Amino acid sequence: MVDLIGKPFADGGRGPDSFDCWGLASEVFRRFGKELPDYQISCEDASRIGAEIEASKPQWVRCDAVNPPVPSLVVMYYGSTFCNHTGVYIGNGRFIHARENVGVSIDRIDGLAWKRKIEGYYVPGW
């Protein structure tokens, strides 16, 4: 996944040269042999993203937050009252995600910027 670090953010980005948060999650899971459904929702539409995350939760299995599996989807609140951001837990307390003005980066799940924004960890239930 080192090759993904620093790739720019693009709304609707599905790779290989740019990603949005869901496009990156899809790429990481693909590398682990799991296909995720594609959602074509603008990153500017936080309420619609939140609604889609809620609607799709029955398809996902919630994991233990103390020791989440690798990979697992990290669902977060990001500047909103809706869950509107995703990343992928990659082990050792780290997750990879894509953000506007930052691009693809790896952060710690227990970092001050993220630990209170994580709603949960999930793996595909299909």
Located regions from the model:
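Short, hinge-like loop/turn segments at secondary-structure boundaries
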Residues: 113-114
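Active-site nucleophilic cysteine motif
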Residues: 13-32
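A glycine-biased structural micro-motif
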Residues: 2-7, 11-13
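Surface-exposed patches in mature extracellular/periplasmic domains of secreted proteins
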Residues: 12, 36-41
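Short, low-complexity, intrinsically disordered N-terminal peptides in bacterial proteins
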Residues: 1-3, 125-126
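...with weaker cross-activation on analogous glycine-rich loops/strands in unrelated enzymes
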Residues: 39-103, 109-110, 124-126
